[in-house]
Amino acid sequence: MNRPRVFVTGSTGCIGNHAVNLLMAEGAEVYGFSRTTSPERQTCDDYHHVSGDLTDADAIRKALDETQPTHIIHLGALQTPDCRDYPMLGLEVNVLGTGFLFRACQELKLSLERFVFASSSAVNGPRSLYGSKGVHTDDPIQPFNLYGYWKVAGEGMARAFHQ
C-alpha cells in the first residue's frame, strides 16, 4: 500500500507543527504549506515545505497539482487578534483562502481520501453560554467575533464541498 501524502496548511503554526510531527511518526509523506519561507523544520524524506499563501489561488492550485495529496488537513488561518485588527485580511485568508483550497481540489479532481477542515469553538460563542455542560454539535452557532464568523463560513464551504 502507498504511504499517505498529506497536505497540511498552516504547517508551521502551533497545531500544524504538532500535526506534522504526528503524521511523520505514523509514516505519512507530509507537504507543509505556509507563508514561512525558511521553516525551522528542514525538508527530509518525509517532509517537504511548500511556501505559499492562502490568499493566492494560483499558488494553492500549483502546490496541490504538484503534490497530488491523498489527504488535506486545513489548519491555516489568521487568528482572533489578527482578524480583529485586520478584518479584511482575515476575510481573505480564512474565507477566500478556504474557498480557493476547495475550488482547487475540485478543479484538479484530486482523489482525496479525506479533507479535514479545522473549525473553532469561536463559532459557538463564549464559554459562559455553556457553563459546565460544554459545547455539543447540535448547539446553535453564535460566533462572537470575526474569527468565529469566518470559521462559520469555512464550515459552510466544507459541507458544500462534501456534498
Language-model segment annotations:
Residues 70, 77, 88, 92-99, ...:
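Conserved internal alpha-helix in NAD(P)-dependent oxidoreductase domains
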Residues 99-146:
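Conserved Rossmann-fold NAD(P)-dependent oxidoreductase catalytic core, especially the SDR/UDP-sugar
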Residues 33-39, 54:
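N-terminal Rossmann-fold cofactor-binding loop
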